[in-house]
Amino acid sequence: KQNLTGLITVKDIQKNEDYPNACKDKNGRLRVGAAIGVSSDFMGRAKALSNVDVDVVVIDTAHGHSKSVINAVISLKKNIPQLSIIAGNVATGEGTKALIDAGVDCVKVGIGAGASCTTRVIAGVGVPQLTAIMDAVDVAKQQDIPVIADGGLRYSGDVAKALAAGANSVM
């Protein structure tokens, strides 16, 4: 009995040549992430995403150093241990430590650093982005947890500063 187990097209070959550094999983598929909040249906959403082999879930909130985010991370790691979790956003070493202790695989740093963001004003919480990155990295590097600098990137030099401050990546 003969079965078709795969199909490669000229377009597939061209994409591999054009994008040799594309981020792919062990099966050669592009990696996929999805953002969820911490509303009452977060677990159902995360399970549905895990069932379709999403690579990472991002718990995306304006202020990640909160009980709801920490409890969501703990619950997700307990119920879907294979799921990679990025959580944030935090602006302090303490917030970073709380998320790491809860079980995150990566921390997003930056509260209200974006040009159009009003989170600092509305929530009354925020730290200058470079300071937030350095404080988070000081804690995260002890546990070998990556840090994503999120926001405050208006000029190309801002990317260099975020990386120089220790962020593993920027968004």
Model regions: which residues?
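Alpha/beta enzyme core
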Residues: 1-171
